[in-house]
């Protein structure tokens, strides 16, 4: 599922398609066609979008053709928890910065992104560095 958000008249509203200065949030359920459309439409390497699908993906920063990828690991409760499993696991969040948009890609339901979304009012997606810091802040608060 793909959501598009934009700040209009000091309010964050969900819109139907990406525009300049939008936040694009990709969350489960994920479809390969959506990744292909985003990759082509926003000129993003496809592997930047699919890296969040690998639960073992390592935190890192990468840049290709003026598109920046930030992968962070965030702790979350293990939904398949049993006696032999850890209560918490870490899952990747991919943050992709293009010239015109910021994207977050999650392959799992992520409480940190939900908290970020709930406090997103009056944020400006065009201020990408501040948005990245706010995502980091919500990850830390969630842990």
Predicted region positions:
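Peripheral, non-transmembrane regulatory/ligand-interaction domains of membrane transport proteins
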Residues: 1-143
